[in-house]
Amino acid sequence: MRFIAFAVIFSAVYLCSSAFTHPRGEWTKLILTQHWPQTFCKMEHCKTDFSYWTLHGLWPNTGVRCNTSWHFNASLIEDILPEMEKFWPDLLEPSSPKFWNYEWTKHGTCAAKSESLNSEHKYFGKALELYHKFDLNSVLLKNQIVPSEKHYTLEDVEEAITSAYGVKPKIQCVHPGQGGQVQILGQIEICVDRDFQLMGCEKSSEDTWSNDLPTVPVSGQSGLSVCDHSMPVYYPPVQA
């Protein structure tokens, strides 16, 4: 009986301490997500001349649409709009703020549970800061991984990023349809903790975020998912 009582007390203390460390619903990881515009437009049947990786989003690992009454207001980020248009463009509607509105409502309102991200300006500003800090364009170029008709191994891409930042990224591709032998590089995720320190992107049991990219098959191909180590990677060049 004493043992049972002790076990109950111990469990209660453990749960309380865990809740104090990570309050229920609080995120523990941010996923900085960059996508390759050429691959996106292959999936969405659009045309783009962006020749560099652009921001897709900054996503907490738990929660979506945490405060739907907190509406996006572009005037609050007016000073960083030129940078947003350049590095976080809406590839489908370049002159529209719809994409930023969507990202704020779905992910920004959840990121805002942290004091360091508790405003539109803090959230979008931090995403831009991290985008420049973890510069995929420079890292891949430095390792001779450039958009072209040649193929790379997934290990080439992973090693380039891991050697630069010391953590393993999550790399996603458009997979070929039946009989296809080449996957298309589409999206790369780099993760940080609540203090914006790098951490691995391995998915944990508490993660509830999901990929925002469409998963509609294109030309017999599957949607975007984690790249396959056994298959060559195609990094498509800008289409003239």
Curated annotation (Swiss-Prot):
SUPFAM superfamilies (alphabetical): Ribonuclease Rh-like
Molecular-function GO term, any one: RNA endonuclease activity
Keyword Disulfide bond: yes
Pfam families membership: Ribonuclease_T2
Compartment(s): Lysosome lumen; Endoplasmic reticulum lumen; Secreted
Residues glycosylated per entry: 67, 73
UniProt cross-references to InterPro entries, sorted A to Z: Ribonuclease_T2_eukaryotic, RNase_T2-like, RNase_T2-like_sf, RNase_T2_His_AS_1, RNase_T2_His_AS_2
Gene3D superfamilies: Ribonuclease T2-like
UniProt GO cellular component terms: endoplasmic reticulum lumen; extracellular region; lysosomal lumen
GO BP of this protein: RNA catabolic process; rRNA catabolic process
Disulfide partners: 41-46, 66-110, 173-227, 191-201
Family the UniProt entry places it in: Belongs to the RNase T2 family.
Protein name, as recorded: Ribonuclease T2
Organism, as annotated: Danio rerio (Zebrafish)
